[in-house]
Amino acid sequence: MSRPIRFGVAAHAVLDADEWRRLAQRVEHLGYATLLLPDHTNPQLAPIPALVAAAAATTTLRVGTQVLCNDLRNPVIAAKEVATLDLLSGGRADWGMGAGWLPADYDGSGIPFDPPGVRVRRLREAVELMRALFDGHPVEHRGEFYRSTGVSGTPRPVQRPHPPLLIGGAQERLLRWAGSVADIVSIGPSWQSRQIGPYPP
């Protein structure tokens, strides 16, 4: 199956409201398809409210997370935030998720930085739970990491069954899983330096 290639801009250090809106408008004007924000505890905008503002300042630009750090929020809350972003953007959201990789995010939040295998298993379970919540029906979930009793995913996203799922990561096991479940897989050359060769001096 062929899919169109989309080009996007990943923003990081904008902290001014007017500058953020202008950046979103500029990205759209230049013809990029998507504006993406990461999810870290360092000085940067919180992704979901910032992306709602970017969507409000534009008309066609897609907005998404690259990626939500799964361990920084419960998947029930994350599903509500992503669905709200999709609703308020008129169906222009991309749903980006990652297992978490930056120790500073965990240290600053007081969250244990578990081994990669544990974080990946938790991400897989969170994505499964969020998919169920996007359906809008009451969800009963008893998993290794999460429990949910009778909560309904509201609001429902505009895009059905859910916004395009972007999984970010570098670990081979995670990328194999991402290739089987995600609409978009985000990898960076710096994460794969052993496969493509070292950086130049």
Q: Which residue stretches match the model-derived regions?
A:
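Active-site-adjacent structural elements that line small-molecule/cofactor binding pockets in enzymes
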Residues: 1-201
